[in-house]
Design a protein with these regions (language model features):
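Residue-level signal for the short linker/turn that defines the boundary of a DNA-recognition helix
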Residues: 37, 113-114
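Short, amphipathic alpha-helical "recognition" segments used to contact nucleic acids or chromatin
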Residues: 98-113
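Short, Lys/Arg-enriched anionic-surface-contact patches
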Residues: 82-102
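Residue-level detection of the helix-turn-helix DNA-binding "recognition helix"
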Residues: 44, 123, 134, 138
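RNase H-like nuclease fold core
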Residues: 133-167
Length: 167
């Protein structure tokens, strides 16, 4: 649709098909530019679309207006695995109703204020904000743990290298 809108959205292989505004909300209908997806089990590409069910997810606000993205949730059939899989998306976690960047934004806002305050500002329930906060916390904790263990492994390897290297 609009190259500037696509550039602002910053999602790979996605274009904005249409844009609508209603009350204080913006709705962007997205379309994927790629016709295939990678199977989650065998990692092979499949272009055999089984079904397409659009869903509505919330994204960061645009100019102070609540923003929703209507995205196609595509399910493909993999001939190698003989099974169906739902396309994974880089901008949202599986089973979530919000973009990753919106969830990260909410997580940061809660750290600066409180769940109650963010709940009022974003017009989401306390339970929703708390669930998003816990989800983001778990992701960050897992990521920090992986980074810590990778760092420890590197340090361990460096110590071994200095012990075995000739001086």
């Amino acid at each position: 649709m609009d190259i500037q809108l696509d550039a602002l959205l910053k999602f790979p292989h996605v274009t904005v098909e249409s844009c609508a505004q209603q009350d204080n909300e913006v709705y962007l209908k997205l379309r994927f530019l790629n016709e295939e997806a990678r199977c989650l089990r065998c990692e092979k590409l499949s272009s055999e679309l089984h079904q397409n069910r659009p869903i509505l997810i919330r994204d960061l606000s645009i100019f102070g207006q609540v923003t929703y993205l209507k995205i196609p949730r595509r399910q493909f059939y993999c001939h190698d695995c003989q099974g169906y899989f739902t396309e994974s998306l880089t901008f949202m976690d599986a089973g979530r109703q919000y973009t990753r960047r919106y969830e990260e934004h909410l997580y940061q806002q809660v750290q600066l204020s409180s769940i109650e305050q963010v709940s009022r500002v974003e017009r989401l329930s306390f339970d929703r904000i708390e669930g998003i906060f816990k989800h983001q916390y778990a992701l960050k904790k897992k990521q920090d743990g992986q980074e810590s263990s990778a760092l420890a492994l590197m340090k361990s390897a460096n110590v071994k290298d200095t012990k075995t290297s000739p001086q």
